């Protein structure tokens, strides 16, 4: 996509507001991002979500507000939908396996997500539309051979370093192989 095709706003006041309201930290640096935003180049920002429930947690709304500020400045916004990974379920901070969702359940949840985040993100901007990408577009194409090749780069010990997994092993609670595949 041509990064110069859209009008990008470089107003210092608006950029400062985007970089300071509801923002705790910017990595690698606030000054570096500010310089990029003032350059006039169209940047790409994305946020990934796994629709594992039929609602958006209120705490996530801040992320969408920040994305909308960058969108209003003319930058490209991608909402990366973890439709494939939602079927696995993020094992972080879980003391037991998440209930596995069907593809249909994930897609139903996604419709609710879109309706809720559509109240924050401007989906009606035809000059700079919000883009949706789905991780199933590439993950569902992986063959078993691809999965084995990827898995050969990691050890069980590395996987067990994750806090949630350590706790479940220590508590002698089941840990299922598919949970290791959650990125």
Language-model-detected regions and their locations in the chain:
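Non-catalytic terminal extensions that flank enzyme cores
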Residues: 1-51
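N-terminal catalytic cores of NTP/NDP-binding nucleotidyl/phosphoryl-transfer enzymes
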Residues: 33-91
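A glycine- and small-aliphatic-rich helix-loop capping segment at beta-alpha/alpha-beta transitions
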Residues: 63, 96-98, 150
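Short, conserved acidic/polar surface loops in the N-terminal third of protein domains
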Residues: 88-93, 143-145
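A charged helix-plus-loop insertion that forms the helical arch/lid used to bind
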Residues: 91-107
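Divalent-metal (Mg2+/Mn2+/Ca2+)-assisted nucleotide/phosphate chemistry catalytic cores
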Residues: 102-103, 107-110, 114, 119-183
């Amino acid at each position: 996509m041509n990064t110069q095709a859209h009008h990008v706003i470089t107003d210092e006041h608006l950029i400062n507001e985007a970089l300071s309201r509801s923002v705790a930290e910017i990595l690698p640096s606030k000054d570096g991002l500010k310089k990029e935003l003032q350059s006039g180049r169209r940047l790409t920002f994305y946020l990934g979500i796994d629709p594992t429930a039929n609602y958006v947690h209120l705490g996530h709304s801040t992320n969408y507000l920040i994305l909308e500020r960058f969108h209003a400045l003319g930058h490209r916004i991608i909402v990366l939908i973890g439709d494939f990974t939602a079927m696995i379920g993020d094992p972080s901070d879980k003391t037991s396996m998440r209930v596995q969702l069907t593809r249909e359940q994930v897609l139903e949840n996604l419709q609710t997500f879109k309706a809720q985040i559509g109240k924050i993100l401007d989906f009606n901007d035809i000059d700079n539309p919000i883009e949706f990408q789905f991780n199933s577009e590439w993950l569902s194409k992986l063959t078993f051979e691809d999965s084995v090749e990827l898995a050969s780069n990691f050890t069980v010990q590395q996987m067990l370093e994750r806090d949630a997994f350590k706790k479940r092993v220590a508590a002698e609670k089941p840990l299922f192989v598919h949970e290791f595949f959650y990125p």
